[in-house]
Amino acid sequence: MTIDDDLSRIAEQEKVLSFDAFDLTTAWQLGKLLQELATERGLGIAIDVTLHSMPVFYAALPGVTPDNVNWVRRKRNMVLRYFRSSYASGLKLQKDGKTVEDNGLSGADYAPHGGSFPINVKGSGCIGAVTVSGLPQRDDHNLAVEALALMLAKDLDTLRLA
Protein backbone atom coordinates (compact mmCIF):
# COMPACT_ATOMS: atom_id res chain seq x y z
CA MET A 1 0.00 0.00 0.00
CA THR A 2 1.10 3.55 -0.65
CA ILE A 3 1.16 6.32 1.93
CA ASP A 4 -1.96 7.78 0.34
CA ASP A 5 -3.71 4.40 0.57
CA ASP A 6 -2.79 4.11 4.25
CA LEU A 7 -3.87 7.68 4.99
CA SER A 8 -7.22 7.04 3.31
CA ARG A 9 -7.76 3.80 5.26
CA ILE A 10 -6.77 5.44 8.55
CA ALA A 11 -9.20 8.31 7.89
CA GLU A 12 -11.91 5.67 7.45
CA GLN A 13 -10.82 3.95 10.69
CA GLU A 14 -11.02 7.24 12.57
CA LYS A 15 -14.51 7.85 11.21
CA VAL A 16 -15.91 4.34 11.80
CA LEU A 17 -14.27 3.67 15.18
CA SER A 18 -16.31 6.25 17.06
CA PHE A 19 -18.27 5.59 20.24
CA ASP A 20 -21.79 6.73 21.08
CA ALA A 21 -20.57 7.22 24.66
CA PHE A 22 -17.29 6.60 26.45
CA ASP A 23 -16.64 6.72 30.18
CA LEU A 24 -14.14 5.44 32.73
CA THR A 25 -15.65 1.96 32.67
CA THR A 26 -15.40 1.83 28.87
CA ALA A 27 -11.80 3.02 29.07
CA TRP A 28 -10.94 0.25 31.53
CA GLN A 29 -12.68 -2.34 29.31
CA LEU A 30 -10.66 -1.18 26.29
CA GLY A 31 -7.39 -1.40 28.19
CA LYS A 32 -8.28 -4.81 29.59
CA LEU A 33 -9.21 -6.09 26.12
CA LEU A 34 -5.83 -5.00 24.77
CA GLN A 35 -4.09 -6.63 27.73
CA GLU A 36 -5.94 -9.90 27.08
CA LEU A 37 -5.17 -9.85 23.33
CA ALA A 38 -1.49 -9.16 24.00
CA THR A 39 -1.23 -11.81 26.70
CA GLU A 40 -2.87 -14.47 24.50
CA ARG A 41 -0.40 -13.62 21.72
CA GLY A 42 2.66 -13.31 23.95
CA LEU A 43 3.22 -9.68 22.98
CA GLY A 44 5.50 -7.54 25.12
CA ILE A 45 3.71 -4.21 24.94
CA ALA A 46 2.79 -1.23 27.04
CA ILE A 47 -0.88 -0.21 26.95
CA ASP A 48 -2.30 3.16 27.90
CA VAL A 49 -5.83 4.56 27.83
CA THR A 50 -6.07 8.26 28.64
CA LEU A 51 -9.16 10.46 28.76
CA HIS A 52 -8.36 14.12 28.28
CA SER A 53 -5.25 14.35 30.46
CA MET A 54 -6.32 11.67 32.95
CA PRO A 55 -4.67 8.23 32.82
CA VAL A 56 -7.33 5.54 33.21
CA PHE A 57 -5.56 2.29 32.29
CA TYR A 58 -1.90 1.37 32.04
CA ALA A 59 -0.25 -2.02 31.73
CA ALA A 60 3.31 -3.06 31.00
CA LEU A 61 3.53 -6.70 29.91
CA PRO A 62 6.62 -8.90 30.06
CA GLY A 63 9.14 -7.72 27.48
CA VAL A 64 8.44 -4.00 27.88
CA THR A 65 11.35 -1.69 28.62
CA PRO A 66 11.41 1.75 30.25
CA ASP A 67 11.68 3.20 26.74
CA ASN A 68 8.13 2.04 25.99
CA VAL A 69 6.77 4.31 28.72
CA ASN A 70 8.29 7.30 26.94
CA TRP A 71 7.10 6.10 23.52
CA VAL A 72 3.54 5.85 24.89
CA ARG A 73 3.70 9.41 26.19
CA ARG A 74 5.14 10.83 22.98
CA LYS A 75 2.71 8.99 20.67
CA ARG A 76 -0.26 9.94 22.86
CA ASN A 77 0.87 13.58 22.70
CA MET A 78 0.54 13.42 18.89
CA VAL A 79 -3.07 12.26 19.15
CA LEU A 80 -4.02 14.82 21.78
CA ARG A 81 -2.38 17.58 19.71
CA TYR A 82 -3.82 16.71 16.27
CA PHE A 83 -6.91 14.59 17.14
CA ARG A 84 -5.82 11.89 14.70
CA SER A 85 -3.80 8.71 14.98
CA SER A 86 -0.08 9.07 15.59
CA TYR A 87 0.51 6.83 12.57
CA ALA A 88 -1.54 9.10 10.28
CA SER A 89 0.39 12.11 11.57
CA GLY A 90 3.69 10.35 10.92
CA LEU A 91 2.69 9.24 7.42
CA LYS A 92 1.53 12.75 6.54
CA LEU A 93 4.83 14.21 7.76
CA GLN A 94 6.73 11.58 5.76
CA LYS A 95 4.68 12.34 2.65
CA ASP A 96 5.36 16.06 3.03
CA GLY A 97 9.06 15.53 3.78
CA LYS A 98 8.70 17.16 7.19
CA THR A 99 9.37 16.38 10.85
CA VAL A 100 7.57 17.30 14.06
CA GLU A 101 10.24 19.93 14.57
CA ASP A 102 9.10 21.60 11.33
CA ASN A 103 5.75 22.11 13.10
CA GLY A 104 7.45 23.71 16.09
CA LEU A 105 7.25 20.61 18.27
CA SER A 106 9.98 18.75 20.11
CA GLY A 107 10.82 15.19 19.12
CA ALA A 108 11.45 14.60 22.82
CA ASP A 109 7.74 15.16 23.46
CA TYR A 110 6.04 14.08 20.21
CA ALA A 111 6.50 10.80 18.32
CA PRO A 112 4.85 10.56 14.91
CA HIS A 113 4.91 6.76 14.97
CA GLY A 114 2.10 4.24 14.90
CA GLY A 115 0.41 3.04 18.04
CA SER A 116 -1.79 5.80 19.43
CA PHE A 117 -5.35 6.21 18.22
CA PRO A 118 -7.95 8.84 19.11
CA ILE A 119 -10.91 7.90 21.24
CA ASN A 120 -13.71 9.63 19.38
CA VAL A 121 -17.26 10.11 20.62
CA LYS A 122 -19.98 10.96 18.13
CA GLY A 123 -20.97 14.60 18.51
CA SER A 124 -17.97 15.39 20.73
CA GLY A 125 -14.85 14.40 18.79
CA CYS A 126 -11.58 13.28 20.34
CA ILE A 127 -11.81 12.85 24.13
CA GLY A 128 -8.64 10.85 24.66
CA ALA A 129 -6.29 8.24 23.23
CA VAL A 130 -5.54 4.54 23.36
CA THR A 131 -1.85 3.79 22.91
CA VAL A 132 0.20 0.65 22.31
CA SER A 133 4.00 0.48 22.29
CA GLY A 134 6.41 -2.40 21.86
CA LEU A 135 5.79 -3.74 18.35
CA PRO A 136 6.75 -2.33 14.97
CA GLN A 137 4.71 0.87 14.55
CA ARG A 138 2.28 -0.54 11.97
CA ASP A 139 1.57 -3.51 14.26
CA ASP A 140 1.07 -1.19 17.26
CA HIS A 141 -1.45 0.77 15.17
CA ASN A 142 -3.24 -2.36 13.95
CA LEU A 143 -3.54 -3.76 17.47
CA ALA A 144 -5.17 -0.59 18.77
CA VAL A 145 -7.55 -0.60 15.78
CA GLU A 146 -8.36 -4.28 16.37
CA ALA A 147 -9.35 -3.66 19.98
CA LEU A 148 -11.52 -0.69 19.03
CA ALA A 149 -13.18 -2.68 16.23
CA LEU A 150 -13.92 -5.54 18.64
CA MET A 151 -15.44 -3.18 21.21
CA LEU A 152 -17.57 -1.45 18.59
CA ALA A 153 -18.51 -4.66 16.72
CA LYS A 154 -17.01 -3.37 13.46
CA ASP A 155 -15.61 -5.55 10.66
CA LEU A 156 -11.86 -5.62 11.26
CA ASP A 157 -11.10 -7.06 7.82
CA THR A 158 -12.41 -3.90 6.15
CA LEU A 159 -10.53 -1.62 8.56
CA ARG A 160 -7.10 -3.19 9.16
CA LEU A 161 -4.05 -1.88 7.32
CA ALA A 162 -2.63 -4.61 5.09
From Swiss-Prot:
Offer one Pfam family short name for this entry: HbpS-like
> SUPFAM superfamilies attached here?
GlcG-like (SSF143744)
Q: Which domain of life does the protein's organism represent? A: Bacteria
Q: Which family does it belong to?
A: Belongs to the UPF0303 family.
- PANTHER family to which the protein is assigned, alphabetical: PTHR28255, UPF0303 PROTEIN YBR137W (PTHR28255:SF1)
The protein, known as: UPF0303 protein RL3365
Query: Source species, please?
Result: Rhizobium johnstonii (strain DSM 114642 / LMG 32736 / 3841) (Rhizobium leguminosarum bv. viciae)
